[in-house]
Amino acid sequence: SQQVSTGFRHDDCQFYMPGFWYRRNLRSPKEAPSFHTSDSWLVREDRLSSPLTGIYSEKAKRFVTVNRLDKFESDALTTHREGEVILSGKTSLGFTGFENRDGIATLSFGFPYREAPKSYIRKLTLAPQVEAFQFLKGGETVVLNWVVFEDAAEDFSDFIRHTWEYCYDTYAPKPVDTPYSIEEMKSTLSS
């Protein structure tokens, strides 16, 4: 795993992981990921709408983000959902998040995935942390690409605007093409 120190005091910061974490998540119930549980969170990249973590310093009016640029093409099953797990095959999923390292806000990311201090199974369900390991044959390599970006923002809203626009431009989301109608999907999900 890799860590990038922002140099910002952790207590002066707000945090963002698209679709998962906004500010300090203090309005979330205690069963959901929030500062009520921990001030450091690492999650699988597929838990997020974009594989990105951002830290905004309200005092410095600056932010630092890390995002993954690789294609996510595979995942592998495990026999366990907590503790140290060995993957059954290849995965392209890593992790991203933020940590309080001796009072300094730090971006953390790596491969394969880790979730700490808890794993987020589904809405309002936290489980013990997990750390995955993938077998590599001698001489085999895995090339991964993350981008660390730093800039200024007038406030947290400006930081979110900038980051959202960056994610939209970078990942260019498109509607999902499905052979099923909305009515068929609703019928299947409700039965």
Descriptions of predicted regions:
Residues 1-138:
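Beta-strand/loop-rich accessory regions of lumenal/periplasmic or secreted enzymes
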